[in-house]
Design a protein with these regions (language model features):
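Serine-esterase "nucleophile elbow" of acetyl-processing enzymes
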Residues: 1-52, 203, 207-210
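Alpha-helical cap/lid subdomain in secreted, periplasmic
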Residues: 47-230
Length: 230
């Protein structure tokens, strides 16, 4: 079993992939989430996993913000992250480094956002990434479940007929949502806000556990009390 997503999938404490084995017969989970991932990055990583790994029992994908983009370089030197929100990771499979969180130089990031980034385009591309990933996983006959990290990943008003048709070609039965078209962010804020660390926007582990239990598996089974109280 493999998980892909952003920091709502892999962070500095246990996230939802940690708890999936508690409900699926303890099948081994490989968490390939990366903080700052955009949907192009997530799609590429999911497709690469499908090509790289044999006998994938299930793939779980949590889509990220439409505003994010990636920067590719061939740098292999050590990444000095101190004082910077962005970071890069060398990918042996693709033979390049991916910058997560946007361009590392603020002026270039702002220039890109001002002159090249377009909101309508980003929403359209997100649907493309979802659709492409579904087509590939279907071809490989890999079972999969898709989710969103918050309700801004998708929208109800479409900019064009093409965007509407692309939306209609996505298999939405493969998605799990909270309260209509909401994601983990809203689920955690609505139900587990008292557990948040002050100043932290990422859901605490208890919210991730209940996301798996209540949303993903809709299970009545409770974990051991000592685990729950950690």
């Amino acid at each position: 079993t493999i998980a892909h997503g952003c920091s709502f999938t892999r962070y500095g404490w246990p996230c939802w992939p940690k708890f999936v084995p508690w409900f699926n017969g303890n099948i081994r989970m490989i968490n390939k989430g990366r903080s700052g991932s955009g949907n192009e990055t997530i799609s590429r990583a999911a497709i690469n996993s499908a090509m790289k790994h044999d006998m994938i029992e299930h793939m779980y994908i949590m889509w990220s913000g439409t505003d994010r983009y990636e920067v590719i370089t061939k740098d292999r030197i050590a990444d000095e992250r101190e004082g910077r929100a962005t970071y890069y990771v060398w990918d042996d499979d693709c033979q390049w480094s991916t910058w997560y969180g946007g361009h590392p130089e603020k002026d270039k990031h702002e220039y890109y956002r001002r002159h090249f980034w377009n909101e309508e385009h980003q929403y359209y591309r997100t649907l493309e990434h979802i659709h492409r990933t579904q087509l590939f996983l279907d071809k490989k006959r890999i079972p999969y479940t898709m989710m969103i990290f918050n309700n801004y990943v998708l929208r109800d008003n479409y900019y064009s007929e093409s965007e509407q048709e692309l939306y209609n070609n996505i298999d939405w039965t493969k998605f799990l949502f909270y309260k209509g078209r909401k994601g983990l962010w809203e689920f955690a804020e609505d139900n587990y806000k008292e557990y948040y660390i002050p100043g932290e926007s990422h859901p605490p582990p208890i919210a991730h556990y209940h996301w798996v239990k209540d949303i993903m598996f809709q299970s009545e089974v409770l974990c051991k009390e000592d685990e729950y109280n950690k």
